[in-house]
From Swiss-Prot:
It holds the Pfam family RnaseA. CDD domains: RNase_A_canonical (cd06265). This is Ribonuclease pancreatic. Keywords: Disulfide bond, Endonuclease, Glycoprotein, Hydrolase, Lyase, Nuclease, Secreted, Signal. Endonuclease that catalyzes the cleavage of RNA on the 3' side of pyrimidine nucleotides. Acts on single-stranded and double-stranded RNA.
Length: 156
């Protein structure tokens, strides 16, 4: 009788361990939508002309760990406005994919570019506040931005 129970329980235990092993790494993984928000959203502030803005933000948002991210853009608009871009003008992404969308109106952004000669761990960025249309890649359910593709001057 005890042998019968162990024959049933052993495969069940193996299945439970496999499921836990598969699910556990994804529990701590940041979703693409959350990563987009961490790397690109700064709704609570206006574009800064402070030369230290990008240096501070890139470090604060964990984009200088292990290497210096060469280019990044922060968007200074409400998250809902950026999410709504996913339902605006459809455009082709830089990589050829077809899930990119361009904002109907210009948005306040700050471009951060690694300065020439800057090397990890001393990442130094040039800060450029701008007003431009943004292009984002969207996916998921709900359909939300997961990648900042570009910013453009005009709407054409």
């Amino acid at each position: 009788m005890a042998l019968d129970k162990s024959v049933i329980l052993l495969p069940l235990l193996v299945v439970v361990l496999l499921v836990l092993g598969w699910a556990q790494p994804s529990l701590g993984r940041e979703s693409r939508a959350k990563k987009f928000q961490r790397q690109h959203m700064d709704s609570g502030s206006s574009p800064s002309s402070s030369s230290t803005y990008c240096n501070q933000m890139m470090k604060r948002r964990n984009m200088t760990q292990g290497r210096c991210k060469p280019v990044n853009t922060f968007v200074h608009e409400p998250l809902v406005d950026v999410q709504n871009v996913c339902f605006q003008e459809k455009v082709t992404c830089k990589n050829g994919q077809t899930n990119c969308f361009k904002s109907n109106s210009k948005m306040h952004i700050t471009d951060c570019r690694l300065t020439n000669g800057s090397k990890y761990p001393n990442c130094a960025y040039r800060t450029s506040p701008k007003e431009r249309h943004i292009i984002v890649a969207c996916e998921g359910s709900p359909y939300v931005p997961v990648h900042f593709d570009a910013s453009v001057e005009d709407s054409t």
